[in-house]
Amino acid sequence: MNDSPTAPTASKVIAFAPGRCDIQQAQQAQQAQQAHQAHQAHRAHRACRDEALPIAENICTVRSNDWINPEYKHLVLSAPATALTAVAGQFFHIACPPGADEAAYLRRPMSIYRVEPDDERIEFLYKVQGVGTRGLARLAPRDTLDALGPLGQGFRLPAVAPSERAHVLLLARGVGLATMAPLAQEAIRSGARVTAILSARSASLVMSADYLRESGADVLVVTDDEQTSDVVQIERMIRRVHAAQAITFATTCGSNRLLSTLQRLTAEFGIPGEIALEQHMGCAIGACYACVRPFRKHSGSDELTYRRVCWDGPVFDLQETTSW
């Protein structure tokens, strides 16, 4: 019998509509704060959300909060039903508890690592590196945690012909590995083949490899220590994978250099791709415009537009994303 704390959980739903999704083209980056007046939809299949969006403030209960390597912890929560609707690529805005002698003023955005509705469970991987995450690291079983969400636009797996088996490539580094895990699970459930290339500074910092293998993914690990993680070798690896079975969809998270490499290769292969972006946020519900970034107006365009990572993303079209 599982003696882990189960949910004295609750949620409060707030109706929120941040306004029309029509962004006027900004002329310069410093004008981004004016983008709340209007902005254009960035992709045809991402519909404008004018209606009120129910946003849940979920009171979750900690089941475990364990170190998995010298830098990262694995947080497992019992969560109410409103939190269990999260999909791959979405995130929660977490109210971090105070640390030993400091407290985080703002919530912290955190990508979903795993959602298990049957067990009323959500999970996160996070790097302990600042005021907020040091507070999170102090959480113990049966503590409660306020998590606003699920928030943002998640990944969307493209349809493939009935005669074709989808082949999804996941390319991630560092904490970006956590974002890729639920997408791998979703793709495998849909019948797709999944190849995951996991990059880290050292083998001890590679996360999710065993979990992805157990889920059915082909996992390739590259590290700085072994001098296998440079973009030249990663590109060769992707080309070999594509030659063995054509990749039909590619995703990445966690590295600017991986973004540039994957943009070039997906354009060459003629396949779609998406990226999950990491960004500092204020409100995480589209109201404060603290997370606005420049994007290409469309694939191949030199014209820029500005979008809110929290509301229009954090998942975006790969070819429309600019380097940072």
Residue ranges and their predicted role:
Residues 48-143:
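Ferredoxin-reductase
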Residues 131-282:
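FNR/FR-type flavoprotein reductase catalytic core
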Residues 18-24, 279-314:
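Local cysteine-cluster metal-coordination motifs and their immediate loop/turn environment
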Residues 26-44:
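Long, intrinsically disordered low-complexity tandem-repeat segments
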Residues 233-239, 287-292, 324:
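Short, surface-exposed amphipathic charged segments that create phosphate/polyanion-binding patches used
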Residues 1-16, 21:
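N-terminal acidic, proline/glycine-rich, low-complexity intrinsically disordered segments
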